[in-house]
Regions:
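Short, conserved phosphate/pyrophosphate- and ester-handling motifs at nucleotide-, phospho-/glycolipid
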Residues: 178
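A contiguous, well-ordered beta/alpha segment that forms the leading edge of an enzyme domain
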Residues: 2-174, 184
């Protein structure tokens, strides 16, 4: 019985010591954070504005800008030199790792949703006026005519190249790219 009581006291002392270290560590971290400045970075990427506010010892604007630029150079339809824009212009190019990763994810989601999610919607997006062109409410005939070359099953990734069944098929990763860029 005495060993059991001694063991409990020892465990209580260890728990108290651990809790004390945890509290002191938390207080030190919080007090250090209070002394760190806030930074506010703004810019344009993916055809839209971004605002980032963060607390850090140094301004990370250049690093943030560089990472967002990588996403823009791969996935932005608003950047005429991006990988996706060049694919949409039917250039035979090797895609970068980022594009391949996002394309594979989009393909998976398209399959899981039975095509409700589809990265080949660029012609539809443009027809409705959400992309580069200002549109009006399109006719049923216009929509139906685009269906001939839209659909995730009409495009695939073979190694580092995108293969389209129809050269009029255009990709739009906007539904994934902005979130992906935020996560990067």
């Amino acid at each position: 019985m005495k060993n059991d009581t001694t063991g409990r006291r020892r465990l209580s002392k260890l728990s108290l010591a651990f809790l004390s270290v945890l509290i002191i560590g938390t207080v030190l971290i919080v007090s250090k954070q209070r002394n760190m400045p806030y930074h506010h970075n703004r810019g344009m990427v993916f055809g839209t504005m971004y605002n980032i506010i963060y607390q850090n010892e140094k301004d990370l604007h250049a690093e943030i800008e560089a990472e967002l630029k990588k996403v823009d150079n791969s996935l932005s339809t608003f950047n005429s030199n991006s990988v996706i824009s060049r694919i949409n212009s039917n250039e035979r190019i090797a895609v970068d790792e980022m594009f391949a990763e996002v394309f594979t994810l989009a393909e998976k989601i398209s399959g899981e949703t039975g095509g409700a999610f589809d990265i080949t919607v660029a012609p539809m997006v443009n027809l409705w006026g959400f992309g580069f062109k200002n549109g009006i409410t399109p006719s049923k005939h216009s929509i139906d005519s685009l269906r001939a070359f839209t659909g995730y099953e009409k495009v695939r990734l073979e190694g580092k190249r995108v293969v389209k069944k129809d050269s009029r098929t255009m990709l739009d990763c906007s539904a994934i790219a902005k979130g992906y860029g935020t996560d990067v």
